């Protein structure tokens, strides 16, 4: 009976995907002659779908920022030389998607449309304006250039047109009209034999979230988004894919290891867990059917913790009470956290030991197998921890990946000890004080005072120009 109820609730689901002083920003050119069907302003759909819109808007209540680097300064060392060592906050409400990508230190402080450290692709999961630009310019046109180029055009937060074909008759009639608004996501699903247009309703519900909640990388000269699923979705499959094309996101500034940075692989880890294997979708747990004041059922678009809507989520399938299930989840979360910290400790030592080996005169040939072990260890660790909900989605897979990461890190440190001995170094390599985020950032040479000052200037001068330009072009409501 519970399963029938769940299926009935699923049928009506409407879903969204569950992750800057001068006048140099010229007037944007008018929309091209291509057919454009994406409406990016979410408030356009409020009269037609008031309950869904108001619940989506309520994601602004999820406003707390949690500083992951302050909580765990080891991360600064693991990401030395990469923008994540500057700033990494845990996710919050979809209503902050554009704000957060503007404000993070990772995107730098560009002064012109051609300035800054990151490519246009960094907007890809932040706004329905991305789908609009892809329709107007094509994928090659959208991905071309620096992140700052998109500032005056990508201004609306994640919303309706990211997940729904809002121009369709079905949507006008109140049906979900789910769609993959990113062509690269559609190609990725085809690579794992899941073409969207042939998928069932439940599969589509999770695939729409999987447009953004996935591992991806920036491919080619244009730095276009691609999912590394050609060999499969398991951590070893993606590792094999990246190794075959000799891809790295960056080189760790301490160990000189060509590194991989996992993003937010919820779709992959969910697929590996008990819920994914039984096709209990993202929607079932994070966007349940609820009743409005008149008793009408609608899909709650305030995406959040299933325990906040226990009766409408977990209780549809589970007979245990809320406290019992919370205890199980908390135990799994703690087990993953404990192993995560142990792996990080080994990796921190490995990066500093590798630096010591280089400083002692180690050759590329001597270091190659060691760096490969560090690369693989940190990749497996990162894929396990970058999905913040893995303790719920796939705890067994999380522990398996972390165990494998521990083995690889141990292999690297064993080889490093032997190599260092040949260089006359037999003592333990000391670590600097990395007990706080600030001390760890100082240890890798970051000038955080300058970085923060540049960012604040950018936010005060460039971002207001972006928003003014967007209003002039009717991309934002006045």
Swiss-Prot record:
One of its GO terms (biological process) is nitrate assimilation. Belongs to the cytochrome c-552 family. Substrate binds at residues 216, 264. Heme c 3 binds at residues 94, 209, 212-213. The gene is nrfA. NCBIfam families: cyto_c552_HCOOH (TIGR03152), PRK11125.1 (NF008339). It is found in: Periplasm. Heme c 5 binds at residues 275, 314, 317-318. Its EC number is 1.7.2.2. PROSITE patterns: MULTIHEME_CYTC. Heme c 4 binds at residues 282, 285-286, 393. Pfam families: Cytochrom_C552. One of its GO terms (cellular component) is outer membrane-bounded periplasmic space. Its cofactor is Ca(2+); heme c. This is Cytochrome c-552. Heme binds at residues 122, 125-126. Heme c 2 binds at residues 160, 163-164, 301. Catalyzes the reduction of nitrite to ammonia, consuming six electrons in the process. SUPFAM superfamilies: Multiheme cytochromes. Keywords: Calcium, Electron transport, Heme, Iron, Metal-binding, Oxidoreductase, Periplasm, Signal, Transport.
């Amino acid at each position: 009976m519970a399963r029938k109820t769940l299926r009935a609730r699923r049928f009506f689901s409407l879903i969204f995907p569950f992750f800057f002083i001068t006048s140099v920003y010229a007037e944007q050119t008018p929309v091209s002659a291509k057919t454009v069907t994406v409406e990016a302003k979410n408030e356009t759909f409020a009269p037609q779908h008031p309950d869904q819109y108001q619940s989506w808007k309520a994601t602004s209540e999820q406003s707390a920022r949690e500083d992951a680097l302050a909580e765990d300064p080891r991360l600064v060392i693991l990401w030395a030389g990469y923008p994540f060592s500057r700033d990494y906050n845990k996710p919050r409400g979809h209503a902050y998607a554009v704000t957060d990508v503007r404000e993070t230190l990772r995107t730098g402080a560009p002064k012109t449309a051609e300035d800054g450290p990151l490519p246009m692709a960094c907007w890809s999961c932040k706004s329905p304006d991305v789908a609009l630009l892809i329709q107007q310019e094509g994928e090659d046109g959208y991905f071309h250039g620096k992140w700052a180029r998109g500032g005056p055009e990508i201004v609306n937060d994640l919303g309706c047109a990211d997940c729904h074909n809002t121009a369709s008759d079905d949507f006008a009639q109140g049906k979900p009209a789910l769609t993959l608004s990113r062509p690269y996501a559609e190609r990725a699903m085809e690579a794992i034999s899941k073409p969207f247009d042939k998928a069932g309703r439940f599969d589509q519900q999770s695939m729409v979230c999987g447009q953004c909640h996935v591992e991806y990388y920036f491919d080619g000269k244009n730095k276009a988004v691609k999912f590394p699923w050609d060999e499969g979705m398991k951590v070893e499959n993606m590792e094999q894919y990246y190794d075959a094309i000799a891809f790295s996101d960056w080189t760790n500034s301490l160990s000189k290891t060509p590194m991989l940075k996992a993003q937010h692989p919820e779709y992959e880890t969910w697929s590996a867990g008990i819920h994914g294997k039984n096709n209990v979708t993202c929607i079932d747990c994070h966007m349940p059917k609820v009743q409005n004041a008149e008793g009408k059922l609608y899909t709650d678009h305030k995406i959040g913790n299933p325990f906040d809507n226990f009766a409408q989520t977990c209780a549809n399938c589970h007979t245990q009470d809320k406290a019992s299930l919370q205890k199980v989840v908390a135990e799994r979360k703690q087990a993953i956290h404990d192993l995560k910290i142990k792996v990080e400790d080994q990796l921190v030592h490995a990066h500093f030991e590798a630096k010591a080996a280089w400083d002692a005169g180690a050759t590329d040939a001597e270091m190659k197998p060691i760096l490969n072990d560090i690369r693989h260890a940190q990749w497996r660790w990162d894929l396990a921890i970058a999905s913040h909900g893995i303790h719920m989605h796939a705890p067994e897979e999380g522990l398996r990946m972390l165990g494998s990461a521990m083995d690889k890190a141990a292999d690297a440190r064993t080889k490093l000890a032997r190599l260092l001995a040949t260089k006359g170094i037999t003592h333990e390599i000391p670590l600097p004080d990395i007990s706080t985020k600030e001390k760890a950032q100082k240890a890798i040479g970051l000038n955080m005072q300058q970085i923060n000052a540049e960012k604040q200037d950018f936010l005060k001068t460039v971002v207001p120009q972006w928003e003014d330009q967007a209003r002039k072009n009717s991309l934002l409501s006045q």
